[in-house]
């Protein structure tokens, strides 16, 4: 197979739970810990729950990756808050091979997780790559510990919500 459409990629993907199930015991244990650290303000929770459009999230990432463990868990929270949201997970290899050309990202520069936000017709609204912008704007070594402790999960939530709101 030389190409896959965004819809084919979404359909071949797995659930968040299945992707987590592929991890080691310690990798799996980080998910509920990270989930419990997602402290969304009430107004954001209301914004998310009040979105009445279907939103599809295609994630290229894998459970062994700490960035995936943190940022894909934010999507899980979004999906738990709003049943109009769907999530599908594909491997990094599939993302590099098939998703990177769709997003016009060089394969060598493709990072995980890459989270593609789409409408109900699979039109791409935008994407989030690897870490929130606030983390990328800092010297990673200076904030690494806070990042891995989940102190930037709200930044991820804001970026993803901004992509959705820009297109509603």
Give the ranges of each region predicted by the language model:
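Thiol-based oxidoreductase modules, predominantly thioredoxin-like and allied folds used
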Residues: 58-62, 75, 84-98, 118-120
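Local sequence-structure signature of Cys/Sec-based thiol-disulfide redox active-site neighborhoods
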Residues: 46-81
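Non-globular targeting/processing and membrane-anchoring segments
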Residues: 1-54, 101-111, 120-168
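Secondary-structure boundary elements
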Residues: 81-82, 166
